[in-house]
């Protein structure tokens, strides 16, 4: 994330490196990290798709989000500061890994699977910060697309090798967002004091997984003819986390467009694809 381009002076709070250190396991934040700071962008959390979901890994996924937020809450409760707003990442996983054809609004209920429960606990921890009188906003982020960041390098790799195939039916909805628009949403939430609560961080036009794959293959001038990989095989290999590739959701961007008069730079996936691949 590069808010510097938006005119912000940024200090980084990290477990290692960065400008200031914190240690979630010990509940410690360097008090100097808050000096002269008027807003926090909270992005902490272990990667959802980096490891198979063992019981221990699932605990880590939840704890890395909930405990880091609790440490932040405790610090904001006790350390003198001039912070007025906290903008936190969240995820469209709040609605569940697979919501079928239903359109998910910010008011839609949470899903019932692990992904939804993890995100629900995360958001509940973030909401505690609002009790301190600070403005709090959460961004339920979809599939982030960028040349080097987000999910695009992962999903495009097998296609680049000529080994692209749909995972499951290919009919799953993919609610995506170009990284540039995601940064613009975070920036809008930082600078606009009228915005609080939860916002979906997705582009206006979701796309079916199969169509997304075909567009990537076409842009890369690669064949896309291999048969779909069946769901049972993916569940056998990936276990519970197969829901990440077999499920999908159709998430609405209307609220951020209406509340912030926000206009997306990349509305359709093919527009984002052209920018990412420079075609």
List the predicted regions and their residue ranges.
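Catalytic helix-loop patch of NAD(P)-dependent Rossmann-fold dehydrogenases
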Residues: 63, 99-138
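NAD(P)H-binding glycine-rich loop region in Rossmannoid oxidoreductase-like domains
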Residues: 17-71
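Amphipathic terminal alpha-helices
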Residues: 267-279
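NAD(P)-dependent short-chain dehydrogenase/reductase
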Residues: 127-138, 142-173, 179, 216
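Conserved Rossmann-fold NAD(P)-dependent oxidoreductase catalytic core, especially the SDR/UDP-sugar
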Residues: 70-113
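Mid/C-terminal beta-alpha module of Rossmann-like enzyme folds, strongest
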Residues: 189-240, 277-279
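Alpha-helical substrate-binding/gating segment
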Residues: 156-164, 172-207
